[in-house]
């Protein structure tokens, strides 16, 4: 997680440094926490989340969270390469290219059967190999029933289970917080974009949150609630700018394995959110203010 969350930027990193998707996701998480803690109103949360998803630089994100109480400072972002380092790498790259060209020339001189070492028309390796193309069709529309169940299946294939601290599902990508298998005191964050990538950040463990099975909810009911959420909140479907679903354990100590699902909907005319249980039971509705 980049160190722009209210703390000084890493050496070599400036407010003009381009933001990554993981930086934007981290900002949205802090804004979600600020909404739940009462630091932000629903309208402020909607405006800041909308700005965070469109942020271009770390400075843009830093301004959105600078006045919030961030509990823990994340790991520092790696410093940018110096001009001297870039120059050194450039020289190494040039030397590598030269050695490759030399190798091509030697190989052509020994084995070549064309007029030029750059003429590959007679390459004996350019023959049909009978390998058919593999077309990948990973889940993309994650707010549909097929997309949502497909995402959970992809999670099982990647990690062997669907255990974790929190799953945030956007229309076309998702993020997942899981326990670090090497140290159960730490949390690893993963991003899904057609497949679960490598861990993008490691943050301090949240001791008061349980690890639960994040798939233990009625997916069909959840999709129905998502599709009806704009009308439930008094918004037009065509006005919706963003919608995302958070799946996490309930804070009720009497039901530690139960899930709480929070659905946030934003538009240019206000936003609101719904909180419901894994079986679809509505717990809370926050209408646009």
UniProtKB/Swiss-Prot annotation:
Its subcellular locations are: Cell membrane
**Membrane among keywords:** yes
Judging by the UniProt lineage, the source's domain of life is: Bacteria
Its signal peptide is 1-19
Q: Which keywords describe this protein according to UniProt?
A: Cell membrane, Membrane, Signal, Transmembrane, Transmembrane helix
Keyword hit for Disulfide bond: no
Q: Name one Pfam family in it.
A: DUF1707
The entry's cellular-component GO terms read:
peptidoglycan-based cell wall; plasma membrane
Q: Topology with regard to the membrane? A: Multi-pass membrane protein
Transmembrane region(s)? 90-110, 257-277
Primary subcellular site in the record, as a coarse category: membrane
Which PANTHER family does the entry mention? DUF1707 DOMAIN-CONTAINING PROTEIN (PTHR40763:SF4), MEMBRANE PROTEIN-RELATED (PTHR40763)
Name listed for the protein in its UniProt record: Uncharacterized protein Rv0048c
Species? Mycobacterium tuberculosis (strain ATCC 25618 / H37Rv)
């Amino acid at each position: 997680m980049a160190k722009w969350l209210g703390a000084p930027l890493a050496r070599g990193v400036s407010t003009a440094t381009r933001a990554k998707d993981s930086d934007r996701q981290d900002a949205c998480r802090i804004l979600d926490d600020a909404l739940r803690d009462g630091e932000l109103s629903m309208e402020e949360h909607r405006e800041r989340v909308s700005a965070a998803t469109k942020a271009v630089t770390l400075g843009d994100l830093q301004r959105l969270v600078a006045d919030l109480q961030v509990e823990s400072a994340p790991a520092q972002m790696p410093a940018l390469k110096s001009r001297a380092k870039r120059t050194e790498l450039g020289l190494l790259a040039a030397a590598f290219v030269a050695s490759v060209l030399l190798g091509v020339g030697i190989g052509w001189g020994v084995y070549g059967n064309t007029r030029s070492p750059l003429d590959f028309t007679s390459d004996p390796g350019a023959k049909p190999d009978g390998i058919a193309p593999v077309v990948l069709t990973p889940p993309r529309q994650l707010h549909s029933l097929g997309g949502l169940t497909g995402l959970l299946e992809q999670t099982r294939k990647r990690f062997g289970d669907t255990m974790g601290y929190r799953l945030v599902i956007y229309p076309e990508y998702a993020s997942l917080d899981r326990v670090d298998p090497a140290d159960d005191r730490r949390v690893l964050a993963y991003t899904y974009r057609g497949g679960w990538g490598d861990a993008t950040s490691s943050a301090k463990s949240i001791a008061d949150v349980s690890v639960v099975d994040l798939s233990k909810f009625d997916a069909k009911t959840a999709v129905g609630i998502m599709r009806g959420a704009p009308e439930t909140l008094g918004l037009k479907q065509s006005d919706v700018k963003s919608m995302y679903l958070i799946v996490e354990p309930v804070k009720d100590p009497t039901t530690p394995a139960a899930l709480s699902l929070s659905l946030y909907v934003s538009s240019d005319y206000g936003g609101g959110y719904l909180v419901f249980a894994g079986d679809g039971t509505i717990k809370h509705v926050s209408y646009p203010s």
